Curated annotation (Swiss-Prot):
Molecular function per GO: DNA-binding transcription activator activity, RNA polymerase II-specific; RNA polymerase II cis-regulatory region sequence-specific DNA binding; zinc ion binding
UniProt keywords, alphabetically: DNA-binding, Metal-binding, Nucleus, Transcription, Transcription regulation, Zinc
Disruption phenotype: Does not affect the production of oxopyrrolidines A and B.
Disordered as annotated region, ranges: 1-29, 60-113, 457-476
Organism: Penicillium oxalicum (strain 114-2 / CGMCC 5302) (Penicillium decumbens)
Name the UniProt record assigns to this protein: Transcription factor opdR
CDD domains in the cross-refs: fungal_TF_MHR (cd12148), GAL4 (cd00067)
Known DNA-binding region: 25-53
GO biological process: DNA-templated transcription
Source lineage: Eukaryota, Fungi, Dikarya, Ascomycota, Pezizomycotina
Main localization, broad class: nucleus
Amino acid sequence: MAQDQNVPLVATSPPRKRRRPPKSCDPCRRRKVRCDRKFPCGQCERARTALQCNYAPIVTASSPSGGDISHLAAPSVREGDSPPSEPADPQRPSRPSAHSSHLLPPEQHQSQNKIIQNLQRRIRRLEDQLPYPATSRTTTGPDSDVSQAQALRHLHDRVLLTEEQWSDFSQPNNLVNGWAIPAIQPRLRVTPDKTKVFGPSHWLHTAEKFQVLGKFDAKEVEPSLQGVDSRSEVAGILKDCRHLRQTMKAQESVRLNHPVPDILSTLPTQEVCDSLVDAYLRTFELIYRIVHIPTFWEDYRRFWTQPQSTSTHFLMQLVLILALGTIFYSDRSKRVNLRRLAHTWIYAAQWWLVGPSEKSTVNLEGLQVGCLLLLARQTNILPTTSWLSVGSVLRMAMVMGLHRAPDLFPALSEYQSEMRVRLWVTVLELTLLSSLDASMPLPFSLQDIDCMAPSNLDDEQFGPKTERLPRPQPSERLTESSIQILLHKSLPVRVEAVRLLNNQHRQELSYETALRLGTELRSACRDVAALFDTARNQSRHVTPSSKMAPFHLRFIDTYLRRYILFLHRPFMIQARKDPRFYLSRKVCLDSCVVIASYADHLRLPSDNLDDLSHLAIVGRGSFKGALSFDVIISLGLEIITQLEEEASTRPSGSSPPFVADHLDKMAKANRVPLIRSLEHIQEQLLQIIALGNPSLKRYNFLCAILSQIRAMESGQPIQPAIYATIKESLLKCYTLLKASHAASSPQESVESLTTGPDSLPDFDVDALDPALGLEIPSLLFFPGLMDMSGTEW
């Protein structure tokens, strides 16, 4: 009976109709648009959602074969999303069977390979973010010659294991201070004219949870017409709204005349431009990595064949590079005119960067122009507030997300990632430089930065079309990035040094900390010497290391020793009355002697100058090198301190000439090289004034220092000697400036004086009589003590 009841139930039940399997991909089915059934389909490619294109598997009665992987689910992890905390759904749609990959056209097969590589990189990023080493890391990734079926199977295994580990990790942990959740990862928007990062507190991370908005694309957050049927009514309305919006914004914008409407007409001949570009690339570019050299040369050659079709951002890069190249141009007959043109180019680039087109410059090209602009203003005798300007460039870089690790943004190409890292390190270096020179706090914290160091690669090893960066060279192999990597190694120490020096709320300056940082910076100087020693040893080979020049060694050595000088200078001053800090006197003296020695190559009025000498003539702040005020006053103070110590050992009431014992004679002999170094700097500063550069403070102050030293050595009254010296030095300055101004027309002048050519007043040297009660600081033009705002220091 039971058998009679059971058999008919199965035999008589009507056959269940099987649902027709879908042929369109899942995104097209959701959007209800026609799918061309390719992989990825045309609709998904136009909507920039190629990675989300997937097809439902065709379920058959037989079990899948070894090569069929259509039953596997490969969930997509979008950029910036938290990893899924739930296990993979076995009913979730997946990619088409890998059996069909060999039947696809070559371009589609290549597209699938790119998708697999992209997924591998994104899964690797998820594994790296695990709080403990992922088990899947021990599994070697598939080689490039394996089938797509094997590659996808390998990815499937890694996805399942990573999801399981993330699921365990994403469960709230009962911590001491409460409950914790995974940090929200940033999102990056990259469009042709703008790059922007969306931080953890941005509304985007909440808005994307609304299903009505759908999934945001990794590259473009705003709605796009590419995801809407252009024949629909919605698409037409959206087009009209966007067009009207752009029209209204154009009407409201202020139309200003460009200060240099035809910048192409200001460029010199191609031969001169070639020389200027080469001068920049052989000097600054190897220290501050800004451009990709092969790409720049390609654009540069294209510019001379099709100048009218050149993009504006490349034109701005070019004119700033030319402006930086004028520093090292040796032809004096053309140098004056090129310097004037350099000022024109700098103002034009600044207008483009922060003028009406400011919003469209927030991208890598705009940031490159910003970095070049900072360097150009620092080296062309232009009035500048570098600390304010570099703060804007720093914030621009952070808005673009350069301070975050590129691995967080898998939509970036390998070329973009590496260039972002290089540019970010350059921005940090320029920011650190400006804070040190301006004696202001740093506007960033290393705790907010997780960007890695640049790769040790030559520019020829990768480019915009590179899909995968080659393996970085060993550290002992010198490349075009070796100098930047070496500077990046000492970056944390220098950041701590600037924070210690410019801490606005400190009560005390720790001597132990200063000693520790000074020792680490001294070690960094040795690393620099070792790097260039390696470069010299490898110079017999045809390698990029041959591009390293003495300019780079002297520039970086001067730069690092300034940190040592600044760290110990407060204790050097204190050591004049507290001998416990005598070591700081010695450290400051050693640093100044090394820096001042680099001025030996500066031999004005000769034209045979090296690159560092050319830079010292026109540079600002740290770029003045041996001619900086810091070196002058530190050396002068050490000599005067030694003379004061000698005077304190003489019997009271003794009068000149003083009797010198053997120790006094040895001390005087040791001071002779220091005094000669200051006298050489004094002569070079006077020659710079003769070139038409109205930089007066350093020269006149050094004249006063040397006058005091001579008076103390001879036992003569100090104040009358200083007044007489200042009278003579000011008269020299006035004579040289007047001659330089008369010889230059307004169109040819490098720096015109504030008064007209016929309105220069006569200089009354008798006004400098000490009986008039004028203070020496006032005679030396110190700010706040005398109104000399029109004079350039």
